[in-house]
């Protein structure tokens, strides 16, 4: 039984690492893989299973933080960026992405999270609402890709202004609807703001890390009492799997996104909706899942 639990933890960590920062909705995949198949709540209990998902999400967040560590060091003037000549070089570049861009982008989701986090968790984490989010998010991504073909000179991440950062932040707040996908929503909005796909993805990930760290820390503070010593190895293997797979997935995604764009991910999401709908409405699998 212990080996089976470890395998389940490994699978869930891999799924989290693959999907957290891809525009495909990690929530939708967790419903399909965990709630409909592996059912971690059956051997962890509902509260511990929720805490486990927070822990493995942290693995993905740390992976993104590692990939963009140089950007964060630069914005915070840490390490080699303490050097005045290096700082002067970066400051001299027009509209260099800075910490204020990230903070401005975080404002909408931060406010919405404080006001409605409990409501969203209680009422929107159901299979039908996630399917709606998956489908609408896919349509939004297709629209963004269609628009991007008309943009002649897309902007880089260092050309983002504060208004654009705030608008992209609004789309991050909208993506608190489960299934909509934070990265799918914000990358699409960035593309609509005339950024190229890679730059929109860069800003999405850079902006997402601090707010996801804060949200995860808050969840752990609320639920730390449900972390049992016997479950620590299970949490650890899920965390490490999410971190390692997340590193590979993020680097691969950033390398490919300007070539493949968003439509393939949108089509995948629609297929995922169909699969979940067949299992849910056709076979009754996951009927008991709700917020």
From Swiss-Prot:
Transmembrane recorded as keyword: yes
Molecular function, one GO term: undecaprenyl-diphosphatase activity
Documented EC number(s): 3.6.1.27
Keyword set includes Cell membrane: yes
Pfam families reported for this sequence: BacA (PF02673)
Highest taxon of source: Bacteria
TM segment ranges: 1-21, 48-68, 100-120, 124-144, 160-180, 201-221, 230-250, 270-290
Remaining remarks: Bacitracin is thought to be involved in the inhibition of peptidoglycan synthesis by sequestering undecaprenyl diphosphate, thereby reducing the pool of lipid carrier available.
Family, per entry: Belongs to the UppP family.
Protein name: Undecaprenyl-diphosphatase
Annotated source species: Staphylococcus haemolyticus (strain JCSC1435)
């Amino acid at each position: 039984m212990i080996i089976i639990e470890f395998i389940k933890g490994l699978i869930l960590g891999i799924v989290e690492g693959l999907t957290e920062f891809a525009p495909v909705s990690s929530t939708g995949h967790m419903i399909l893989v965990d709630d409909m198949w592996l059912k971690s709540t059956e051997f962890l209990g509902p509260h511990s299973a929720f805490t486990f998902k927070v822990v493995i999400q942290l693995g993905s967040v740390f992976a993104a933080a590692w990939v963009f560590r140089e950007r964060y060091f630069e914005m915070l003037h840490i390490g080699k960026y303490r050097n005045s000549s290096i700082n002067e070089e970066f400051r001299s570049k027009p509209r260099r992405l800075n910490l204020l861009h990230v903070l401005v982008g975080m404002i909408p989701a931060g406010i919405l999270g404080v006001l409605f986090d409990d409501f969203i968790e209680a009422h929107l984490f159901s299979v039908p609402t996630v399917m709606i989010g998956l489908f609408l998010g896919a349509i939004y991504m297709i629209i963004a890709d269609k628009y991007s073909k008309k943009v002649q000179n897309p902007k880089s991440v260092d050309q983002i202004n504060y208004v654009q950062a705030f608008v992209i932040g609004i789309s991050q707040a909208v993506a608190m609807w489960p299934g909509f996908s934070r990265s799918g929503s914000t990358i699409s909005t960035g593309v609509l703001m005339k950024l190229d796909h890679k730059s929109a993805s860069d800003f999405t990930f850079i902006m997402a890390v601090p707010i996801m760290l804060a949200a995860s820390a808050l969840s752990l503070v609320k639920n730390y009492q449900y972390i049992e010593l016997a479950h620590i190895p299970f949490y650890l293997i899920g965390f490490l799997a999410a971190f390692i797979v997340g590193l590979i997935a993020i680097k691969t995604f950033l390398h490919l996104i300007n070539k493949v764009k968003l439509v393939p991910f949108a089509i995948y999401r629609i297929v995922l909706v169909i699969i979940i709908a067949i299992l849910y409405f056709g076979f009754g699998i996951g009927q008991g899942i709700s917020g």
